[in-house]
């Protein structure tokens, strides 16, 4: 079992901190009791990320023009697709609620509704544009690609579950990169730890990493940011 964290500048992709416990002392490399600590699970392992994917889904819905913060849907607490039933975390329905409440209360049925309004194929394409299922390009070894084959499925249930981070498995660094785009005007950046290369001769060279494109509009990004501030101000305080 691991615990870890990543702190990144969403506008540049510069990684300020990336750490995992348990770890090892690089000055005493051969003395680790468990060789598993030599792996970096933030780069090399994949996980079903769950509800932290919901802001991405909301951003997609805003960008596609199928919802606004005031758009309402009838939350019955469950939704059945392809013979499978998905439920809110507590199984309860909220009745007619706006999209702001989908984020405030982390409603699975709400983000599944957004995915259905966007359309399964288009929604899957959006998630791929966020870099989910591809390498981020981080300048660290052994990066693993996420498991996102479900985004090519003809079944609507796969996209509904993906909308709240289940059924697809992602590396933490790929997830952080995708979330960073939401705070960067919709622009995806390459995460990186290097800034400059210094040579023995005394010369140095700045290292640059490219932006990877606009995944949602700046307007959608700004609207989503206001919605997430609303979550903190009204639902968490």
Regions found by a protein language model. Name each.
Residues 3-51, 56-237:
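Beta-lactam-recognizing serine transpeptidase/beta-lactamase-like catalytic domain environment
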């Amino acid at each position: 079992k691991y615990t870890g964290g990543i702190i990144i500048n969403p506008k540049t992709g510069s990684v300020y901190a990336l750490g995992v416990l348990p770890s090892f002392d690089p000055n005493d490399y051969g003395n680790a009791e468990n060789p598993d600590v030599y792996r970096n699970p933030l780069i090399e392992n994949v996980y079903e990320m769950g509800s932290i994917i919901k802001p991405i889904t909301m951003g997609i819905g805003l960008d596609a023009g199928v919802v606004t913060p005031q758009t309402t849907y009838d939350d019955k607490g469950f939704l059945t697709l392809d013979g499978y039933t998905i439920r809110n975390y507590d199984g309860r329905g909220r009745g007619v609620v706006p999209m702001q409440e989908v984020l405030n209360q982390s409603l699975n049925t709400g983000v599944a509704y957004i995915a259905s309004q966007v359309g399964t194929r288009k929604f899957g394409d959006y998630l791929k544009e966020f870099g989910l299922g591809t390498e981020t390009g981080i300048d660290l070894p052994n990066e693993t690609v996420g498991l996102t084959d479900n985004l090519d499925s003809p079944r609507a249930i796969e996209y509904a579950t993906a909308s709240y981070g289940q059924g697809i498995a992602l590396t933490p660094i790929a997830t952080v990169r995708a979330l960073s785009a939401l705070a960067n005007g919709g622009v995806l950046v390459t995460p990186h730890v290097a800034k400059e290369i210094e040579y023995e001769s005394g010369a140095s060279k700045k290292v640059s990493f490219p932006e990877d494109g606009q995944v949602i509009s700046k307007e959608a990004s700004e609207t989503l940011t206001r919605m997430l501030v609303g979550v903190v101000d009204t639902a968490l305080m």
